[in-house]
């Protein structure tokens, strides 16, 4: 019995020695040593959303746009910058030349894109002046609460879109806002038709070339979780692309938060068991 008690005592000391550095990362309170504190509510589990199915937006008129496009004709806005990136063309690496003769492998021949060449614009911006979110954003964006973003930080930028045109399926990332309006949440997240009758989605030259469509054609599109995106040409390029840079997936940060929460709960349970029981 004495030997067994000694072994238990040694095991307890070893566990305390291993976990003490972890306790030191939490704030101390009074004379009682470090206190482990946890959020009152666990962070959402991203794995629960991996198979989320979003509704289709059908027969939506698409137009072609590209990074570096100058204002002209109906287009009154320069595409050297996007609604979320003031240096869009610079960060992309140059001009996303739409001329088919100047393109190969769904990208310009003159340089390798530093961002995903498969991108789209939808007529909604969840942020106002990069400082705060639109009043309805937290209510209408299905994944908003998953990320609990800081004011002015977009939860729409980089989201994946599935597109369908004449029996071909393509995937792209949402990287700009438009065409024509940037507040049409009833269409983007609801069942309403686009407020603009001219177009409801802009697609990049890479999307155009993969699907074989031209400006003015109608397609179907819907949101899709990154876990449901297969590999393809849309997985080849870009630091904003989770296929290339896993840290670009916003769920990575949420998974970290969830793991930290679970670790804290385990530490709390361990400390509770180690505390002497009052007699």
Where are these regions (language model features)?
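N-terminal secretory signal peptides that target proteins for export/translocation
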Residues: 1-10
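Bacterial N-terminal signal peptides
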Residues: 13-24
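Secreted/periplasmic proteins
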Residues: 30-278
């Amino acid at each position: 019995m004495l030997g067994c008690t000694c072994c238990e005592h040694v095991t307890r000391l070893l566990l305390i020695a291993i976990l003490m550095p972890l306790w030191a990362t939490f704030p101390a309170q009074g004379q009682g040593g470090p206190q482990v504190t946890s959020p009152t509510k666990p962070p959402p589990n991203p794995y629960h959303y991996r198979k989320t199915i979003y509704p289709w937006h059908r027969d939506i008129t698409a137009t072609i746009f590209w990074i570096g496009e100058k204002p002209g004709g109906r287009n009154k806005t320069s595409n050297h910058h996007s609604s979320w990136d003031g240096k869009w063309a610079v960060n992309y690496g140059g001009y996303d030349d739409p001329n088919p003769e100047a393109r190969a492998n769904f990208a310009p021949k003159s340089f390798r894109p530093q961002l995903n060449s498969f991108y789209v614009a939808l007529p909604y911006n969840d942020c106002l002046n990069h400082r705060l979110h639109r009043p309805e954003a937290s209510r209408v964006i299905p994944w908003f609460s998953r990320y609990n973003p800081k004011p002015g930080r977009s939860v729409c930028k980089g989201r994946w879109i599935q597109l369908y045109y004449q029996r071909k399926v393509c995937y792209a990332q949402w990287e700009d806002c438009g065409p024509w309006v940037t507040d049409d949440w009833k269409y983007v997240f609801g069942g309403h038709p686009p407020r603009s009758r001219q177009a409801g989605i802009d697609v990049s030259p890479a999307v155009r070339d993969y699907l074989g469509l031209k400006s003015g054609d109608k397609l179907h599109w819907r949101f899709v979780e990154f876990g449901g995106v297969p590999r393809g040409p849309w997985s080849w390029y870009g630091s904003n692309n989770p296929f290339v840079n896993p840290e670009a997936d916003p769920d990575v940060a949420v998974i970290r938060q969830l793991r930290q929460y679970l670790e804290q709960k385990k530490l709390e349970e361990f400390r509770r068991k180690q505390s002497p029981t009052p007699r």
